[in-house]
Each structure stands twice: as C-alpha cells, then as structure tokens.
C-alpha cells in the first residue's frame, strides 16, 4: 500500500479578504502560518515520513510546505516546485471580493465560476497588469501555457501531466510523497483519484491547512482517504470554503 498526503495552503491574505486569488502571488496570514505549522505537527505526531515534497510556484503554498517540513524537522528534504500545481486561474475575477461579485452577478453565476467543471470566469486581457505572462517564473512557458482564465476542466488538463510524469512515478518507486498546493489543483487530483463526475465535483471543497491522506493500492487506486486530526473540524472548514462566494 502507498500513501499520498495532500495539503491545501494555509489561509492567505486574500482568503482573509474573501478575494478571488488564482495565480496572484499573495502570502499567508498569521493564521495561515499557524495552520501550516499545525499540519506539520499533526504529521509528525502520527509518525509520517516523506522522501520528496512537491508544491506550486506561488508563495502561499511554498511557505506552507516550508512550515510543515520545519515542524517535522525535515527542511532538508528535496522540494520540487511546479507551475502545474498552481491554483486555478480566475481570470478577470482575480482581486475581486467574492461576496461583492455574487451581489453583482448572482450566487448561481459565481458558484458556476468557482465550482463547476467547465465554466471559466471572464478572461483577463493579455495586456492587463494582473496577467502573469511577463512574470519571470513563467519565462520558460509558452504564452499559451500561461492562462488568462481557467475552469476546473482546464486545471485538470494542466495538473494531470504532473501526476503522470512526476507524482505517480515517485509513488510507484516507493517514495513517500507530500504535496502542498491549492484548493483547485487538489480538487483536480481528487477528481481523478476518486473518479468524481463533472457534476458532483461542484460539491467538493478543500479546507486550508489540513492534511488529506490517500491510501492507494498497487495500481494507485484509492483504498480510502481521510483528513488527519479532527474530522468534524475539517468538515466545518470545508463548509466555510463553500460559503465564501455567496452574497
């Protein structure tokens, strides 16, 4: 049996402000730092060990991983950063308040933008200062690889090559893997692992800073999955994520 641990980053400054974040590179709040540290303490207390760690190129996930590994006294572990693990790009919604956007467009439209499988938000213009196409961290990518908006279907298409090319081979090689990423990049992985339908994925929310453990068989098919720590607290945190986009 293999294990895979997925952790959504701790609370970010724009989570606190209830803003659409996407690829905007915002930092953790003091609570987010404590959530990340607590995740590390939980993993250490439960006896988890890792051989390699993966995260995005956005600081809220990278710093979350740092705090997790620091609490585990494993800051020396190899860390792989990949743009493929970035949050879903929220296009022209990036920086906007979710509740105010819901008041303007309606709860149903914002829910579709946030949680449906194939409805992208309005795209950024390529010349919009919020666009990441001039960001040095993406210099090796083609312009088409740096999105102007994404739906979850697009995020799945971006994340899954990383599963096949990096995560799955590492797990099958016996490496103990931890991934610190984002709500929607983790939703993409969970959709694949649990074979969740396009319709049902709308109801899946990932809480900040709580380790999600997958036990996998020899074919990397899930045997079971669970959140470490208080299951009721994890459920409440996921419900809070679901309510963020309501007027």
From Swiss-Prot:
Active site per the UniProt annotation: 9, 87
Binding-site list for substrate: 8-15, 21-22, 60, 87-90, 98, 114-115, 183-184
Gene Ontology molecular function: phosphoglycerate mutase activity
Keyword annotations of the record: Gluconeogenesis, Glycolysis, Isomerase
One GO term of the biological process aspect: glycolytic process
Pfam family, one: His_Phos_1
Record PANTHER family: PHOSPHOGLYCERATE MUTASE
Function: Catalyzes the interconversion of 2-phosphoglycerate and 3-phosphoglycerate.
Family according to the record: Belongs to the phosphoglycerate mutase family. BPG-dependent PGAM subfamily.
Protein name in the entry: 2,3-bisphosphoglycerate-dependent phosphoglycerate mutase
Gene giving rise to this polypeptide: gpmA
């Amino acid at each position: 049996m293999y294990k895979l641990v997925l952790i959504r980053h701790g609370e970010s400054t724009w989570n606190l402000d209830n803003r659409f974040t996407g690829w905007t590179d915002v930092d953790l709040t003091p609570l987010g730092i404590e959530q990340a540290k607590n995740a590390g303490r939980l993993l250490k207390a439960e006896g988890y060990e890792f051989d390699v760690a993966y995260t995005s190129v956005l600081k809220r996930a990278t710093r979350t991983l740092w705090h997790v590994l620091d609490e585990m006294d494993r800051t020396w572990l190899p860390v792989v950063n990949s743009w493929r693990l970035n949050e879903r790009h929220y296009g022209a919604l990036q920086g906007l308040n979710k509740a105010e956007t819901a008041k303007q467009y309606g709860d149903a439209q914002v829910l579709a933008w946030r949680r449906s499988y194939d409805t992208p938000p309005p795209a950024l213009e390529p010349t919009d200062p919020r666009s990441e196409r001039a960001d040095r961290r993406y210099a090796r990518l083609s312009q088409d690889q740096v999105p102007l908006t994404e739906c979850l279907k697009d995020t799945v298409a971006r994340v899954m090559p990383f599963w096949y090319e990096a995560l799955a081979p590492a797990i099958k090689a016996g490496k103990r893997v931890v991934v610190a990423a984002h709500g929607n990049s983790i939703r993409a992985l969970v959709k694949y692992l649990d074979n969740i339908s396009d319709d049902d994925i709308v109801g899946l929310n990932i809480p900040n800073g709580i380790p999600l453990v997958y036990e996998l068989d020899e074919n990397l098919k899930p045997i079971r999955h669970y959140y470490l720590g208080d299951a009721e607290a994890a459920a409440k945190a996921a419900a809070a994520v679901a309510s963020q986009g309501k007027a």
